[in-house]
């Protein structure tokens, strides 16, 4: 990547590094603010709970003529049993086949509720290697799901946009029949907005959470709010473990419930993962806007350099080049690959296998264009694409949304 820098700072800070440092600083501030809010909300409740527990412990010790040390020793034994999966109420076995299957599901999905953990040395060693392969495979699965989801959403929204143009008479019927005229078609540069995609994913996530909560509330005995809370914690793979579904020994229609629980968690994790990646585009736009505001006081030469074509960056719409050329991703220069390797994004298989010039995003875009009847066009402006065939989830959404396209 070109070493364009910002004038503030002694060494003309590289743009990618400036964005990385700005994001790191904002995350630290976000953590400090979150800690302050949670401390204000939860600290008093924690102190009250501790006071109630000390009173109950003293009353029980006096009522049964037990010393506090003896009672605490017994409670430590119970804590050890709890870590091994033993509960006061009757719960399902943790390490039969179905319990172990639930456990490996929480491992590879990175949810990690924590209600079941390996206790043997062999189990802990196996978990390290099992999780290394399993978590990597699941991340790949989520990325492939995101790729197909973005393609489907873009196809549906483009079809709706075409129908609207036809009804208004802005799009002749014949223009869509001739595949050779795709490059001059009125929709050649049209892409769905990331805001609409975010709204669709948010609606889908809420719908799945509400339906799952309606199932958990009567079966698990949770309140509806607690069920919604569990859905977010599980679907986002935070996985605190304070609430865990399908842990009782017996349920009505047990097989059906466990299957539905698996399906809801799988769908929820996929949707929330996709939503997080779409939101990250908006966060990156905001970072670029902040960087431009911070650099607005620079000399005119620096400002002209700031407005030049950017690589590997999502720019707000107010300063994007609004040409109508559809920019592809397969003409990216090798310098872009080097820049991405230095940026805050993950390195893709394209970077690891230099001989393979077609990345996941390029293949996906080519397939989409073939499905739409448009021949693949290689543009000389590809090296100026703002995502330049990026990597990871960014590569999947590259040039598929209006805000990730270099032609805006």
From Swiss-Prot:
Residue ranges, annotated region (Selectivity filter 2): 237-242
Keyword RNA-binding: no
Transmembrane intervals: 20-40, 125-145, 194-214, 263-283
Cytoplasmic-side positions: 1-19, 146-193, 284-408
GO molecular function: identical protein binding; metal ion binding; outward rectifier potassium channel activity; potassium channel activity; potassium ion leak channel activity; protein heterodimerization activity
Annotated region (Selectivity filter 1), positions in chain: 110-115
Domain notes: Each subunit contributes two pore-forming domains 1 and 2 which assemble to form a single pore with M2 and M4 transmembrane helices lining the central cavity and M1 and M3 facing the lipid bilayer. The transmembrane helices are bridged by the selectivity filters 1 and 2 that coordinate the permeant ions. Up to four ions can simultaneously occupy the selectivity filter and at least two elementary charges must translocate across the filter to convert it into the open conformation.
Protein name (Swiss-Prot/TrEMBL): Potassium channel subfamily K member 13
């Amino acid at each position: 990547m070109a070493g364009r820098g910002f004038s503030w700072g002694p060494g003309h800070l590289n743009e990618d590094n400036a964005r990385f440092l700005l994001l790191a600083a904002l995350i630290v501030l976000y953590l400090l603010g979150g800690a302050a809010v949670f401390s204000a909300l939860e600290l008093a409740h924690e102190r009250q709970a501790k006071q109630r527990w000390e009173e109950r412990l003293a009353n029980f010790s006096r009522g049964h003529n037990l010393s506090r040390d003896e009672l605490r020793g017994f409670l430590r034994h119970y804590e050890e049993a709890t870590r091994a999966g033993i509960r006061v109420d009757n719960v399902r076995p943790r390490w039969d086949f179905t319990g172990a299957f639930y456990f490996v599901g929480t491992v590879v999905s990175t949810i990690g509720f924590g209600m079941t953990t390996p206790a043997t040395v062999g189990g802990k060693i196996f978990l390290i290697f099992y999780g290394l392969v399993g978590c990597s495979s699941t991340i790949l699965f989520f990325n492939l799901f995101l790729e197909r989801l973005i393609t489907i959403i873009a196809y549906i929204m483009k079809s709706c946009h075409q129908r609207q143009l036809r009804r208004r008479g802005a799009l002749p019927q014949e223009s869509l029949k001739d595949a050779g005229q795709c490059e001059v078609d009125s929709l050649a540069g049209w892409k769905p907005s990331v805001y609409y995609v975010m709204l669709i994913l948010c609606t889908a996530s809420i719908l799945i959470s509400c339906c799952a909560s309606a199932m958990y509330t009567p079966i698990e005995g949770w309140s509806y709010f607690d069920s919604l809370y569990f859905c977010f914690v599980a679907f986002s793979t935070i996985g605190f473990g304070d609430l865990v579904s399908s842990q009782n020994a017996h349920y009505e229609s047990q097989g059906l419930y466990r299957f539905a629980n698996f399906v809801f968690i799988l769908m929820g994790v996929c949707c929330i993962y996709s939503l997080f990646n779409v939101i990250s585009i908006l966060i990156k736009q905001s970072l670029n806007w902040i960087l431009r505001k911070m650099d607005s006081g620079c000399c005119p030469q620096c400002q002209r350099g700031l407005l030049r074509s950017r690589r590997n960056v999502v720019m707000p719409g107010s300063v994007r080049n609004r040409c109508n050329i559809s920019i592809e991703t397969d003409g990216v220069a090798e310098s872009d690959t080097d820049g991405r390797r230095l940026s805050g994004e993950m390195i893709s298989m394209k970077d690891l296998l230099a001989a393979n010039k077609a990345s996941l995003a390029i293949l996906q875009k080519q397939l989409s264009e073939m499905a739409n009847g448009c021949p693949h066009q290689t543009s000389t402006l590809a090296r100026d694409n703002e995502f330049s065939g990026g990597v990871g989830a960014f590569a999947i959404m590259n040039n598929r949304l209006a805000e990730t396209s270099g032609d805006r």
